[in-house]
Amino acid sequence: MKTIMGPLPAIKFDKTRQRKIWFNSMVFAYIGWEDSRNDPVKAVTFGDGKPLPANIVYDCLNILEEESVAFPWQKGDVLLLDNWAALHARRSFDPPRRILASLCK
């Protein structure tokens, strides 16, 4: 099985905030989804099918790392974030992991 999307714009315009936003997970497709069905080098391409040069992907990864903010969690904490305003992820963790999540509108 193979998933093909796109082409998708890396940047969208958020009408609520009246500004351009990075709305894309291309870096994570390149660095994080390698398995028997996914070749990271071919995971992100230009519209003509040519792969994005690795140095550009890694430049984007470095920018994401420089701009990242870590929240030090404490028992009882709750974090609400706007998926349009912030790209979110998590760092690696040591087991056991317990997932408590809720989606709200």
Predicted regions mapped to residue ranges:
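Active-site environment of non-heme Fe oxygenases that use a 2-His-1-carboxylate facial triad
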Residues: M1-V78, W84-K105
